Curated annotation (Swiss-Prot):
This is Malate dehydrogenase. The active site is at residue 174. Belongs to the LDH/MDH superfamily. MDH type 3 family. NCBIfam families: MalateDH_bact, PRK06223.1. GO terms for biological process: lactate metabolic process; tricarboxylic acid cycle. The lineage of its organism: Bacteria, Pseudomonadati, Chlorobiota, Chlorobiia, Chlorobiales.
Amino acid sequence: MKITVIGAGNVGATAALRIAEKQLAKEVVLIDIVEGIPQGKALDMYESGAVALFDTTVLGSNDYKDSADSDIVLITAGLARKPGMSREDLLKINATIIRDVTTEVMKYSANPIIIMVSNPLDVMTFVAWKASGLPKERVIGMAGVLDTARYKNFIAEALDVSMQDISAMVLGGHGDSMVPIVNYTNVAGIPLTELLPQDKIDALVERTRNGGIEIVNYLKTGSAFYAPAASAVEMIEGITKDRKRIIPCTTLLEGQYGIESVFCGVPVKLGKNGVEQILEINLTASELEALRKSAALVEENCKNLATLLG
């Protein structure tokens, strides 16, 4: 198993290290355009193997040739969001970057599974899919895993319970329009609605929607990376170990939930072939409406890129 991580910034480097420590691949390649950065970080990671007890090889490079024959490619490249900058502000800049990165990746790997982390997430997943020519099930966006993790964290904090006992799901686009599904949220099987009043639940939902910007506002010059990296690696682990995990991911919908030809976060079965099944769960009328509105925003942004993508 060979996994390539594109982008040696905070998310990419953290993800590469987690992949190595979990020994999810025989070889991890970290690629970045800045000379010396991927090489230095990769060497540092590799040298930690004797202490962290992993045998995974970690290579840093500026050359996409070193990504040849990758089974999985994690794309984290792009401009990071700054205070006052919406994900949509990043649209044009990152679309160009992702298109070029994906084109380079496909020169050397015939049939990889691509996992997208770069923002705006849903649109960048679309860009990678168009640029790669890969089947839709092999180009996946990391959104719902991260958003759900934040949602679970806030619930656990509010109730003073273990996060391990919380079952929850956040669907829709990765942004202000995301849709935490309260109807399917429970703590050890107990519905959240029986544990918290509606106003508290509404506050948790709102904080989840603003989870990324909350961190951006603290950091000032950067954005979240520990939780995004952990979320991406959870997806990678589900694929490499063929675990058939049911988790929310960004995938191309073709009629599911009444949404056509749009990348949107929904529950999927994740295995060795990528997205192996899209699950259509019963949503309330308001949840379904919110999901469709979220998808419509993604669709609008994708249409704005039509000229760029040709």
